[in-house]
Regions:
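Residues lining hydrophobic/aromatic ligand-binding pockets adjacent to catalytic sites
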Residues: 1-122
Length: 122
């Protein structure tokens, strides 16, 4: 299983595999043609309400992780195909946040990896 995360502002690499933007909003200051993607999975991003509540405040990180995981619980139709793809092919979750330690892509990656370890692909 191979699920990586990468900032949208980083150079794409041949090693990225299947590139999926996991943000509801396009990353600021980037032209769409500058960010090669295989998929833009807006549905997998935290809700606007949760994103605004979190505001990238590290003090709210634990609460954000739990709330976002709860949102993901109801979105299997969107994340399960990515998890299953990652069993055979590398998937890179692309995110726009500047904070590399507190962002939704980290939570999503951990969520997918946990699901694969405990349930396995369908």
């Amino acid at each position: 299983m191979s699920i990586a995360i990468k900032r949208a502002y980083e150079e794409p690499s041949d090693d990225d595999g299947y590139r999926v933007l996991v943000e509801r909003l396009w990353p600021r200051g980037l032209k769409k043609e500058a960010v090669p993607l295989d998929q833009w999975a807006k549905e997998l991003a935290p809700t606007t309400e949760l994103r605004k509540w979190f505001g990238h405040d590290p003090a709210l990180w634990d609460g954000f992780r739990h709330r976002y995981a709860s949102e993901l619980d109801g979105l299997a139709e969107y994340w399960q195909p990515l998890a299953e793809r990652s069993v055979r092919h590398k998937v890179t979750l692309i995110y726009g946040a500047h904070d590399e330690e507190h962002n939704g892509a980290l939570v999503l990656r951990d969520y997918l990896q946990h699901w694969l370890r405990t349930h396995g692909p369908a």
